[in-house]
Regions:
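Acidic, proline/glycine-rich low-complexity IDRs
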Residues: 1-108
Length: 108
C-alpha cells in the first residue's frame, strides 16, 4: 500500500484517500443541492493547499483552488464534471505533498 498524500471529503461524510480522476468524478456526480453540496480535496497533514467543488443554486459548480505556498487563489465555475475532474487532477499533480519523495534527476 502506498503512502497517503491527500484525501477527498464530501459533506455527507464520504471519504476517498488519494482519489483518482474517476473517484473525483463519482464524488462530484453525487453532489446535490440539499445535504451533499460540496467536496473538499486537501492533504491530511498540514494542508497548505486545497480544492473544493460546490453545487451552485443556479446550476453548475463553483471550483475553488487555493495554494498558500504559491500565493494562489482561484475561483471559477463550470458545468461539465468531466472538465472539472480533469482540471483538478492536473492541478493536484503539481501540488507539494508533505512526506512525498522528491523527484531527483540524475545524469548517466
Amino acid at each position: 500500500m502506498g503512502a497517503q498524500y491527500y484525501g477527498a471529503d464530501s459533506e455527507n461524510g464520504d471519504r476517498i484517500d488519494d482519489p483518482s480522476e474517476d473517484a473525483l468524478f463519482m464524488m462530484i456526480s453525487d453532489l446535490n443541492d440539499s445535504d451533499n453540496t460540496f467536496v473538499v480535496v486537501q492533504p491530511d497533514d498540514d494542508p497548505v493547499w486545497f480544492a473544493s467543488v460546490a453545487v451552485l443554486d443556479e446550476g453548475g459548480y463553483e471550483i475553488v483552488r487555493r495554494d498558500t505556498t504559491r500565493n494562489k487563489h482561484d475561483v471559477t465555475t463550470a458545468t461539465s464534471i468531466n472538465d472539472i475532474t480533469r482540471d483538478l487532477t492536473i492541478w493536484m499533480a503539481a501540488r507539494d505533498f508533505p512526506g512525498r519523495p522528491t523527484k531527483q534527476i540524475r545524469e548517466f
